[in-house]
């Protein structure tokens, strides 16, 4: 009798352990996303959309931080942006990402203070570079956007800025493309919604 109880406990524990290991081994990757797998702390492979298998306790899914900005939902006119992480459960998006960065200020060639309101569209084309070549891709893209805006606007006077919104956007996009290629991203477009001058 006692032997049967011990056998039952053993088989229940064994079955639960197997089910737990199987549960940890199968990973679902949603459409238009990928996941990175590390084996014993080193990058091993990229999981594609669908059901994938990993080795539990030896391999793990990387959960990187890719920050982006959204306008404050309580005040849509405000350019005080809310930061948020684009990556949930290790799902790295391969679709186009929209960044509505906080207000940037720049000084034109004729010393006018300019506040360009822009939206940046980019895509992660190489998730390995996007995670391992840069600490936080979203913040880095934003800082690069800010610096590039200041450089582009700094060589133009106020009149050129007013009439050259599209030209400024294209120049910024090509400058960003070149710099961000090393981070595994493709800048698809930069739209300047409005340009305000300090009164």
Positions of PLM-derived features:
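N-terminal hydrophobic membrane-entry segments
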Residues: 1-199
């Amino acid at each position: 009798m006692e032997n049967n109880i011990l056998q039952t406990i053993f088989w229940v524990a064994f079955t639960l352990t197997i089910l737990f290991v199987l549960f940890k081994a199968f990973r679902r990757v949603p459409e238009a996303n990928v996941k990175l797998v590390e084996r014993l702390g080193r990058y091993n492979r990229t999981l594609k959309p669908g059901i994938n298998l990993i080795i539990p306790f030896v391999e793990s899914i990387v959960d990187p931080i890719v920050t982006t900005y959204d306008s404050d939902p309580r005040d849509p006119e405000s350019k005080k942006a809310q930061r948020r992480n684009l990556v949930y459960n290790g799902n790295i998006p391969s679709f186009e990402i929209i960044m509505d960065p906080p207000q940037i200020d720049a000084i034109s060639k004729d010393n006018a203070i300019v506040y360009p309101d822009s939206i940046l569209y980019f895509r992660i084309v190489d998730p390995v570079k996007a995670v391992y070549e840069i600490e936080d891709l979203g913040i880095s893209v934003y800082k690069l956007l800010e610096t590039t805006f200041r450089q582009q606007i700094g060589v133009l006077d106020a009149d050129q800025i007013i009439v050259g919104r599209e030209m400024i956007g294209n120049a910024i996009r090509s400058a960003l493309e070149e710099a961000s290629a090393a981070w595994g991203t493709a800048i698809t477009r930069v739209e300047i919604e409005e340009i305000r001058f300090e009164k």
